[in-house]
Regions:
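Terminal, low-structured helical/coil segments at or just beyond the last alpha-helical repeat
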Residues: 181, 214, 222-293
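Register position in tetratricopeptide repeats
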Residues: 7, 41-42, 75-76, 109-110, ...
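Short, small-residue-biased leader/transition segments that mark boundaries at the very start
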Residues: 1-2
Length: 293
């Protein structure tokens, strides 16, 4: 890595030196690879592509140049091209950790989850403590036949991750996804509750309510629909036009939650599960009543 503790001034000096060398000889593989590495580290991915593609017009076999070229395509989310570049690197004998990792990520981005699983699994075997590898390996596994492994990998990522809020949000979001694919609704709800603690996004409460609703757990469905409704600001509860009047053909999640509570209670009443006196009306919420027909 070229950006180290020397600081930005040293990194800039290094770039100037390599740039001078590049102008003298744009076909020197070491110089091209280092300039492309600086571009990639500085998130100038298109520039990294440009300098490496010029070099590749005369030589497509240099491993260092191709690594930077492939990484730039991956970071640009041009996953199809990135996969081709990384597969070529493997054919050249490169089975380094980063090549396997980025090839797995590129396959994942290109929606070929079995290819992602194979390469990320190999990267994991080289470095089982890398949280990013575990994260993508878990997500790839969840979309293949190895759904149980997906849960295990994501749980392992939790055990070794640095507990920063941003990382925990990412991991809990991934854990929710893995439990969803594995069909473990109970664990999915638990992960969603943890995710809500970190994000405070009320849509998570609505999702939990929907999961309970789908499982026909009426008590918890109503409880979470109400939790969700309590967190929605008054000015976001209904779709209003510029004059503040309700828009008839648009229903918000708040209104949908109210409708589901009403429907669940109606169904319970007709089954004899819910007595008439427990059939509450929202507190003079005339707009909700109007749109819950």
């Amino acid at each position: 890595v070229l950006f180290r503790s020397e600081g930005l001034q040293d990194a800039a000096s290094a770039f100037i030196s390599y740039n001078i060398a590049y102008r003298r000889d744009s076909l020197d593989a070491q110089t091209v690879a280092r300039i492309a590495g600086i571009f990639n580290n500085n998130q100038q991915f298109k520039d990294a592509v440009d300098v490496t593609e010029v070099y590749r017009l005369s030589d497509t076999t240099n491993i260092d140049v191709n690594r930077q070229n492939a990484k730039a395509y991956c970071m640009l989310k041009e996953y199809g091209t990135a996969v081709k570049r990384y597969e070529s690197l493997k054919e050249l004998g490169d089975r380094s950790f980063l090549t396997l990792y980025y090839l797995g990520v590129s396959h994942y981005g290109d929606n070929w989850f079995y290819g992602a699983y194979d390469n990320l699994k190999e990267a994991y075997q080289k470095n089982p403590m890398d949280v990013n590898v575990l994260y993508y390996l878990a997500k790839a596994s969840a979309r293949t036949s190895w759904k149980k492994e997906g849960v295990e990998y994501m749980e392992e990522a939790f055990r070794i991750a640095v507990p920063s809020d941003s990382m925990m949000v990412r991991l809990y979001d991934g854990l929710v996804e893995c439990y969803d694919y594995a069909g473990d609704t109970k664990k999915e709800v638990e992960a969603l509750e943890k995710l809500y603690i970190y994000t405070k996004k009320n849509s998570i409460l609505y999702k939990i309510a929907c999961l309970y609703d789908w499982k026909e757990d009426e008590k918890n469905a109503i409880r979470y629909y109400r939790k969700y409704m309590a967190t929605v600001p008054e000015d976001q509860r209904y779709a209003l036009d510029e004059d503040g009047n309700p828009v008839e053909d648009r229903i918000t999640l708040y209104q949908q939650a109210w409708k589901r509570i009403k429907k669940i209670k109606e169904e319970g009443f007709f089954r004899g599960d819910i007595p008439t006196k427990s059939f509450p009306v929202e507190k003079k919420d005339t707009l909700a009543l109007r749109h819950a027909k």
